[in-house]
């Protein structure tokens, strides 16, 4: 591949030394333009800086990978097990309107801490951070198991997310430390397979465990795997070369953007609380919603300001956001992250309410689409290895996601199980293609020495999209349901205003309250619930279609570079 230096501002970004070693071992390479539409080929003359000529020369590699891949499996398992079980949990605690926070609270902390683990591991060492992430995740699982109420469970999930944010990140970082560059793609493929396998297991067993035994087992079963990962890692995972433990505490606060992390957590939490309280439309929550909205905006503005002046490794390097191309790819990542999680967490509710599935059956229905995601990732990897253009892969992935979400609008109680299974496949295959191709579309627009920071930036933006996918869609369903029930139930002359408000309150708190209503009213409320879920599905489809439009726009506005390549 021909490469040249360019005067374009996006091509000469100064690397952040605190993070350049995390995901990229070649941070010493001079900043040169990389064609973002093709995959750069590794030259046979490339020198690996790890000191190993073969993966078979790495001491205790098998045991190290056992520890790391167990964490990756747990990350995939936890991501879908709550999707299968959150309706059951909401029922038990009579807080169905807060059930989305079981996932949202986890995503807030994991999203924020995920990029921080890179700096933490540089300063404190890989071992300490690996034990910290796995230990906090394990303790969070135990806290979830013993939670006595929804509020306690939400706090437990937040605590669990602090550790969860490092499970995949540290696995990638440690592999980058020890695996020769030419073999790293193979080990990344192992991670993707374990992540997909974990997601399949979580989707398949989450509903079964919550229905047959208890939803608490969904968290308890993760503890032995986490303990095993910690035990194996204790004996075999070592700190990175060049690490010194004698001065790390004095530079801890200089290298890690702790203030930025706190502002981001506060801002995201406030904005998501606005969605939760705002969906109730009650007088008691109206003023707090305004205050939370103001607080959220102020925290986000302050976060952006801190990122622009911090001397630490920023959570979001603002230099990477310059340029229309970068903005379009990041917005695409945000939208497909939002749509992907919204789709995943809407389906179990739809299956149980509209199709009449039990929690276990609804969970098993998610197994097939969960299997489709790693297949999509495998297809993406094969095509990228054959130099298939990344821009076309991104368009294809988002197109399949849009098609799948559109097909989900036609799922109805009388649909054939085979047809239903076919309808569920495209969205997840598209996600398996779209997620990695959006990452490479972004990072290959920058020089090699900026790939680490651009990777963490894209992951963070997509995770924020996932946050609003779960929290936002829950708010859409609750708000639409309340409005529709109020309009339809007022047509009953036998119901006064107080009775209507009680029905609305009970149904929003517990889905089982719906089946305790008189048959005529039950039919109306069930129809309203279906209507609300359909609105959420339509919103998800629109978001994905917008992302598809941005993919087209990205390919039409990308500037031509001096090397002759196009972004």
UniProtKB/Swiss-Prot annotation:
It holds the Pfam family MFS_1. GO terms for biological process: asparagine transmembrane import into vacuole; basic amino acid transport; L-arginine transmembrane import into vacuole; L-histidine transmembrane import into vacuole; L-lysine transmembrane import into vacuole; L-valine transmembrane import into vacuole; transmembrane transport. Coiled coil: none annotated. Keywords: Membrane, Transmembrane, Transmembrane helix, Transport. SUPFAM superfamilies: MFS general substrate transporter. One of its GO terms (molecular function) is basic amino acid transmembrane transporter activity. It comes from the Eukaryota. Signal peptide: none annotated. InterPro entries: MFS, MFS_dom, MFS_trans_sf. Belongs to the major facilitator superfamily. This is Uncharacterized transporter C460.03. It comes from Schizosaccharomyces pombe (strain 972 / ATCC 24843) (Fission yeast).
């Amino acid at each position: 591949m021909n490469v040249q230096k360019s005067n374009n501002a996006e091509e000469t970004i100064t690397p952040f030394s605190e993070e350049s070693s995390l995901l990229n071992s070649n941070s010493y390479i001079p900043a040169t333009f990389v064609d973002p539409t093709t995959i750069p080929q590794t030259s046979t003359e490339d020198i690996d800086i790890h000191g190993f000529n073969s993966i078979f020369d790495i001491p205790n590699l098998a045991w190290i990978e056992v520890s790391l891949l167990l964490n990756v499996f747990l990350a995939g398992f936890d991501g879908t097990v709550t999707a299968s079980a959150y309706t059951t949990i909401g029922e038990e605690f009579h807080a169905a309107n807060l059930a989305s926070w079981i996932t949202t609270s986890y995503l807030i902390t994991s999203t924020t801490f995920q990029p921080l683990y890179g700096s933490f591991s540089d300063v404190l060492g890989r071992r300490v951070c690996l034990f910290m992430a796995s230990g906090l995740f394990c303790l969070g699982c135990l806290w979830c198991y013993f939670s006595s109420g929804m509020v306690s469970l939400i706090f437990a999930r937040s605590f669990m997310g602090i550790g969860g944010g490092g499970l995949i990140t540290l696995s990638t970082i440690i592999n980058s430390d020890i695996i020769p560059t030419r073999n790293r793609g193979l080990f990344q493929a192992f991670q993707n397979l374990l992540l997909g396998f974990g997601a399949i297991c979580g989707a398949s067993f989450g509903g079964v465990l919550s229905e047959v035994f208890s939803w608490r087992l969904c968290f308890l079963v993760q503890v032995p795997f986490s303990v095993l990962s910690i035990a194996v890692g204790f004996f075999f995972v070592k700190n990175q070369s060049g690490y010194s433990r004698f001065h790390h505490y004095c530079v801890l606060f200089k290298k890690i953007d702790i203030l930025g992390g706190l502002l981001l957590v506060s801002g995201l939490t406030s904005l998501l609380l606005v969605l939760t309280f705002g969906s109730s439309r009650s007088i008691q929550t109206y003023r707090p919603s305004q205050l939370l909205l103001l607080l959220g905006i102020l925290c986000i503005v302050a976060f952006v300001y801190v990122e622009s002046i911090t001397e630490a490794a920023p959570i979001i390097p603002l230099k990477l956001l310059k340029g229309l191309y970068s903005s379009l790819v990041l917005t695409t990542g945000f939208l497909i992250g939002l749509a992907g999680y919204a789709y995943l967490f809407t389906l179990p509710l739809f299956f149980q309410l509209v199709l009449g599935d039990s929690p276990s059956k609804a969970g098993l229905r998610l197994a097939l689409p969960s299997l489709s995601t790693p297949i999509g990732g495998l297809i993406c990897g094969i095509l990228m290895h054959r130099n298939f253009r990344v821009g076309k892969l991104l368009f294809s992935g988002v197109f399949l996601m849009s098609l799948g979400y559109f097909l989900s609008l036609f799922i109805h109680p009388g649909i054939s199980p085979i047809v239903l299974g076919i309808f569920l496949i495209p969205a997840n295959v598209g996600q398996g293609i779209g997620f990695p191709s959006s990452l490479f579309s972004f990072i290959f627009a920058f020089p090699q020495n900026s790939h680490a920071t651009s990777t963490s930036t894209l992951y963070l933006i997509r995770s924020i999209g996932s946050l609003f996918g779960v929290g936002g869609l829950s708010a859409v369903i609750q708000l639409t349901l309340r409005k529709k029930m109020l309009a339809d139930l007022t047509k009953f002359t036998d119901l006064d205003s107080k009775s209507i408000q009680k029905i609305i309150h009970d149904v929003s708190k517990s889905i089982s309250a719906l089946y305790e209503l008189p048959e005529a009213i039950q039919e109306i409320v069930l129809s309203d619930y279906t209507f609300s879920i359909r609105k959420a599905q339509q919103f998800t489809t629109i978001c994905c279609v917008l992302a598809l439009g941005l993919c087209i726009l990205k390919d039409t506005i990308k500037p031509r570079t001096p090397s002759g390549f196009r972004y």
